[in-house]
Amino acid sequence: SKKADSKHWVTSELFYDKDGNMYFAGVDSSAWCLYRMNLKTQEISEVFKLDNKSTRNYTKLAGYDGQYFYVFDKPDLSKGIKNITTDDKNIVYILDTNGEIKDTLEFNQESTKTTADVNILGGDRRYLLVTTTDTDIQQFKASSELMSKYEELKKRMETEGSSKLAQVCLSAVLDKADIGTGNKEWIQITPE
């Protein structure tokens, strides 16, 4: 525990709990950290530390729902898609307010086993919402009907010589009651 100082780089993601604590992400020379600051005493303590020596990863505090923190650690796509390998992981660490990992979510493409690009959008108290434009993710594959529509749109755009991209956005939710149980059932909510 230490008094607030400026040696840590702090992001703009601030979250508060019911006990008068503020949580924020920061980095030091070798790690991404989640910190807790008691707003009365200004004491700062480290809650969770993720070794981040690799320049290949991008780590973000994706959210806090009053019970869990969602820390998103994924390959840095700005380094170039060709540099991403099957060793690179796309993981969401689900932590309690003491920094204990309660569960992890990993997103990979089914055909190549490489990382899939997803967005963690929070959700509500009951569900965690995830979206993606990748159509080949193990956890929530696009339906055959949606894929047929997508392929038809891609063909039409190619034959018309359009410079626009045909994209599909898949959405799925995870019941937060499944966190920590080992039974993670994704519920597909993408409209057809």
PLM ranges: what are they?
Residues 30-35, 77-93, 136-156, 163-174:
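Structural motif
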Residues 177-179:
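Short loop/turn segments immediately following beta-strands, especially the blade-tip
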Residues 1-27, 32:
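Long, acidic/polar, low-complexity amphipathic helices and coiled-coil-like
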Residues 5-15, 53-66, 110-125, 187-192:
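Repeated scaffold domains used in trafficking and secretory/extracellular systems
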Residues 38-42, 96-100:
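Short loop/turn segments that connect beta-strands within beta-propeller blades
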Residues 1-2, 45-51, 102-108, 183-191:
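Beta-propeller fold detector
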